[in-house]
C-alpha cells in the first residue's frame, strides 16, 4: 500500500508518498468542474512518490564505485536516466524461479530482529536446515526479518529513531557463497536489504555494490513478508514458484 495516512516505510530523507484529488464533487460544487453532455461528472486523483518508496527492484545501475556500474558500463550512463542496467528488462520479462523463504526472525525466536542485528550465509543455511529445507543453486532467496511489519505496529518516530536496519552483513566469504550459489535475486522485508552500516568496517551498504554492481544480483526491497511467513509456517512449506 502507498500514501497511507499513517505513513509508509521509506528510506530516511525520502519524502512520503502523497495522493491528492485533482477533481471531485467539490469542484462541481464551486462551479469549477468540467461539463459534458448529459449528467457526466467525475473524480480523479494523482500520486507523487519515490519509485523506491514501496516494494520494488533495485536497478543494477542503482549503485556504483570507481565510475563504473554493473557490467563495466560507465556511471555516466545514469545521467538523466539509466541508459544501461535499468529495471526495464525485468518489467518486460519478469523473473521466475524457485523461491525459498528463510524466516530469520522466527528462527531466532523473535517477532522482529533487533535494529542493527546481523546474519550471514551460514546463518541462512542454519535457518534453512531448521525449517527442513535446503537452499539450492539459483534459488530466489526471500529473507524475513519482521522489520517492515514492525513499522505498522509502532510510532513512525520510533521506527526511524537512530535508524539502522537488521540484515545481511558483508564478508568476502558471504559474497563468494552468493556467487557460487548463482542466486539471481534477494528479497527482504527491509528498506535496504542489508544492515545499514557494516559493524566491522563502518561502511554504509557495502553489499549493494558487492552483490549488485559486481555480481549482477537483483535486490527486491520493502516486501511485506509476515503473511507469507505465517502461511509457510502453518503448512511447513517454505519453497514455491
Label the predicted regions.
Residues 1-241:
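Active-/binding-site microenvironments in catalytic and ligand-binding cores
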Amino acid at each position: 500500500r502507498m500514501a497511507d495516512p499513517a505513513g509508509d516505510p521509506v528510506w530516511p530523507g525520502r519524502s512520503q508518498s502523497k495522493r491528492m484529488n485533482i477533481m471531485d464533487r467539490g469542484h462541481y460544487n464551486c462551479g469549477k468542474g468540467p461539463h459534458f453532455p448529459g449528467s457526466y461528472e467525475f473524480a480523479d486523483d494523482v500520486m507523487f512518490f519515490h519509485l523506491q518508496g514501496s516494494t520494488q527492484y533495485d536497478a543494477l545501475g542503482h549503485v556504483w564505485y570507481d565510475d563504473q556500474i554493473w557490467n563495466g558500463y560507465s556511471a555516466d550512463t545514469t545521467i538523466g536516466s539509466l541508459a544501461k542496467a535499468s529495471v526495464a528488462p525485468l518489467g518486460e520479462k519478469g523473473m521466475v524461479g524457485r523461491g525459498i523463504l528463510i524466516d530469520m526472525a522466527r528462527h531466532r525466536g523473535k517477532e522482529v530482529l533487533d535494529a542493527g542485528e546481523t546474519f550471514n550465509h551460514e546463518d541462512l543455511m542454519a535457518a534453512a536446515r531448521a525449517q527442513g529445507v535446503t537452499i539450492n543453486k539459483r534459488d530466489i532467496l526471500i529473507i524475513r526479518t519482521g522489520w517492515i511489519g514492525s513499522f505498522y505496529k509502532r510510532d513512525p518516530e520510533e521506527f526511524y529513531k537512530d535508524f539502522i536496519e537488521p540484515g545481511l552483513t558483508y564478508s568476502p566469504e558471504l559474497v563468494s557463497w552468493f556467487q557460487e550459489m548463482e542466486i539471481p535475486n534477494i528479497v527482504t522485508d527491509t528498506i535496504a536489504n542489508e544492515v545499514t552500516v557494516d559493524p566491522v568496517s563502518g561502511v554504509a551498504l557495502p553489499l549493494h555494490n558487492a552483490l549488485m554492481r559486481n555480481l549482477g544480483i537483483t535486490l527486491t526491497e520493502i516486501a511485506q513478508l509476515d503473511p507469507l511467513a505465517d502461511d509457510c509456517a502453518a503448512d511447513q512449506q517454505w519453497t514455491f514458484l
